[in-house]
């Protein structure tokens, strides 16, 4: 059963002079997750997901005119963020499957393509984990904890990225007088690339074209041929709206990257290899502190896999400050300690699938980062040859170290 939230469920949110919530109810797909403890075991949680605000229809109040155009905000409706909030209405999404999102119990499948009106449409869905209230994001505090999930990456060819990562978004999605919709409608996204998120930033009109910066922990960026994980610290806490040159100095957009192929383990990850991507994989991420407490300094990030009842250790060393010492930007922006501070404050799980029209995902799976050929990441090639491209995440759980998996 999906969680349905109409405007009535937000009666406590201020609506005066604010971007209105429309008449179409939001129908969040449930995604059962698990909170685990070394003594109590794992307890199921009635969580759900929401698509990013940019997937929602935002239109003029009392009319069918969109508040955005192909080039951004409609200036006649949104000359400034206050006027925009008064003129525009956000509608809920009732059928997530039409956006490439399918759920079943504790599993979620994200699809890159879908045939609509006889044409193949590229979808690239990105969803965020909501708390059990369905109104706020689920913010996980993971210092001296572990985060574990199962993933089927077998339908992700070269050039694709089925990602699961953490973003230091605000729990409410930036809910305010100008943004009553908040997390319920997928507002507030940010990451360490500080990209311009489009017409909306923290749920308000992005009239300045600002970038949305925040700390990011990439737990899993992968396809069937290559995988990485990467922390991305920032000098700021939470979402920061950057402009101009500062967007390139606030966060470490590249991060300290752990890629087994790039580190020399070329027969470690892939079809039929040690970590066999032809089969489902359990991925465990552990965030170990210097004093083994939830208030300590992040000292090490460990990765291990479980497949067919066997624990598979990481291909080389774990990620430590020494491992990341060659990344000058990472160290200058605070390194693991700064990343750990964000993990201590709490971060929101993000699930996505996407291709890379600009770089063809070479940074992930080609040019020394993986075994893929130079043209395999071309989105046109992927669409023509792999129309069923998809990723499935399931059994998402977190808790005490060594409490989320068994063999």
From Swiss-Prot:
Keyword Hydrolase among UniProt keywords: yes
- State the signal peptide span: 1-18
**Source taxon at top rank:** Eukaryota
Which molecular function terms from Gene Ontology are attached? cellulase activity
Residues with an annotated glycan are: 136
The main place the protein resides is: secreted
Pfam families this protein is in? Glyco_hydro_7
Which GO terms fall under biological process for this protein?
A: cellulose catabolic process
Quickly give the catalysed reaction.
Endohydrolysis of (1->4)-beta-D-glucosidic linkages in cellulose, lichenin and cereal beta-D-glucans
Looking at the UniProt record for this protein, which Gene Ontology cellular component terms does it annotate, in alphabetical order?
extracellular region
Compartments annotated for it: namely: Secreted
- Active site residues according to the UniProt entry: 216 (nucleophile), 221 (proton donor)
Record EC number: 3.2.1.4
Keywords, A to Z, come to:
Carbohydrate metabolism, Cellulose degradation, Glycoprotein, Glycosidase, Hydrolase, Polysaccharide degradation, Secreted, Signal
Kindly give the InterPro entries that the UniProt entry links to this protein. Answer: ConA-like_dom_sf, Glyco_hydro_7, Glyco_hydro_7_sf
PANTHER family associated with the record: 1,4-BETA-D-GLUCAN CELLOBIOHYDROLASE B, ENDO-BETA-1,4-GLUCANASE CELB
Q: What does this protein do?
A: Has endoglucanase activity on substrates containing beta-1,4 glycosidic bonds, like in carboxymethylcellulose (CMC), hydroxyethylcellulose (HEC) and beta-glucan. Involved in the degradation of complex natural cellulosic substrates.
Q: Which family does it belong to?
A: Belongs to the glycosyl hydrolase 7 (cellulase C) family.
- Name-wise, this protein is Probable endo-beta-1,4-glucanase celB
